[in-house]
Amino acid sequence: MPPAGQDDLDFLKYAMESYVADVNADIGKTTIVFTLREKAGALAETLKLFQAHDVNLSHIESRPSKTHEGCYEVLVEFAEAEDHRKIEGVIEHFQQKAEKKVLVQDWNTKNKQNKDSVPWFPQKINDIDQFANRILSYGAELDADHPGFKDMTYRERRKFFADIAFNFKHGDKIPTITYTDEEIATWRTVYNELTVMYPKNACQEFNYIFPLLQQNCGFGPDRIPQLQDVSDFLKDCTGYTIRPVAGLLSSRDFLAGLAFRVFHSTQYIRHHSAPKYTPEPDICHELLGHVPLFADVEFAQFSQEIGLASLGAPDDVIEKLATLYWFTIEFGICQQDGEKKAYGAGLLSSFGELQYALSDKPEVVDFDPAVCCVTKYPITEYQPKYFLAESFASAKNKLKSWAATINRPFQIRYNAYTQRVEILDKVAALQRLARDIRSDISTLEEALGKVNNLKMK
């Protein structure tokens, strides 16, 4: 029963945790999934909402929620013949009453996207469990032109790594891997050829951090570092963690991980027959290209800003953000002491392109997110154009200014204490933010006062 003094529909704000709505025009059905706290009468009172909007349900099912403790998820379906204005009324009421909004997912009518639609996005770090296994390619399956396609031993090994990733959940420890002599030999070839190039070609931040990885994570030619050791190191440095993944994720899912300072990393290594070539990201690319700079505070923040900008963004913006990621985190160069230096992982894990990118052969232009995000690029050959950043801090500020233009009907912020994304769409949320800002300003003022007192002594 509703609390005293509350009507049936207002009861939802006490009972409902979240909702997801999906209209599939191809099969002529509308689906809404909502999460209810386990309370007597919660489902019955919630279903009255559909009755109030004169919507006839064709299917109902429920199950215990895997992501909300003490709750259960309810799926309801109704036919395409239902008046979409009624459906929109239901969605609008959910938006008003759900305590933790999971906004409308792919809300479309006859393949036309509703102006108020917002794709589903994770709001807490363990929500990543819901999409981490939605890989697009590779994993245990290989294309016919892959160097390891005909090697059944290699393919079995890939399945072993894929199973680890598929069974991983947030909070788990990444299993320790005993790499084979053949795998270590492949790593050694890549490691030895790349590391001699870093002092001259990599950015200062990379060259500062790399020796720390050698000291703390066992980076060296004769041992492939363990992802859990690397994840622990990054956690101490910038709050980033590593999560094993079986293969390529969609741009939306991969960028969503960055929003929570989670980097999805493969554990498998390229085929031994082609140590200088890989058609996909492998552990050499992840550890030698990506990992070092995730330990740098400015770069870590820059990467997270791309992830945060992706949450709830429409598909066209995701494409632009993926392009920004490509030209920065994968193939970015920066200016240091009057020279071009590489900071992109695709460059720092590639023998030939690292030298090519810093030569006079390609076109180099200043980093401008508005231009960068719509620039076409090849995937299977060297880049004809690179974007030059003044610094990570400068690139981050430019990105934030550009991201502010994204048409998203709400603002978000990342709460590092709870590892949640907070939607700033209610007065209470804004008041909490204001209190946090006041507290930080107070801490800053006290620290400045103490520093000034020390100078005067």
Swiss-Prot record:
Residues 31-108 form the ACT domain. Disruption phenotype: Reduced L-phenylalanine hydroxylation. Lack of a yellow-orange pheomelanine-like pigment in the cuticle. Higher cuticle resistance to physical or chemical disintegration factors or oxidizing environments. Increase in superoxide dismutase activity. Increased life span. In a bli-3(e767) mutant background, growth arrest in early larval development, severe cuticle abnormalities with large blisters and increased superoxide dismutase activity. RNAi-mediated knockdown together with fah-1 RNAi partially rescues the impaired growth and fertility defects in the single fah-1 RNAi mutant. Inhibited by tetrahydrobiopterin. Unlike its mammalian orthologs, pah-1 does not exhibit allosteric binding behavior for phenylalanine. Pathway: Amino-acid degradation; L-phenylalanine degradation; acetoacetate and fumarate from L-phenylalanine: step 1/6. It catalyses: (6R)-L-erythro-5,6,7,8-tetrahydrobiopterin + L-phenylalanine + O2 = (4aS,6R)-4a-hydroxy-L-erythro-5,6,7,8-tetrahydrobiopterin + L-tyrosine; (6R)-L-erythro-5,6,7,8-tetrahydrobiopterin + L-tryptophan + O2 = 5-hydroxy-L-tryptophan + (4aS,6R)-4a-hydroxy-L-erythro-5,6,7,8-tetrahydrobiopterin. Catalyzes the hydroxylation of L-phenylalanine to L-tyrosine. Catalyzes the hydroxylation of tryptophan to 5-hydroxy-L-tryptophan. Plays a role in the biosynthesis of a melanin-like cuticle pigment. Homotetramer. This is Phenylalanine-4-hydroxylase.
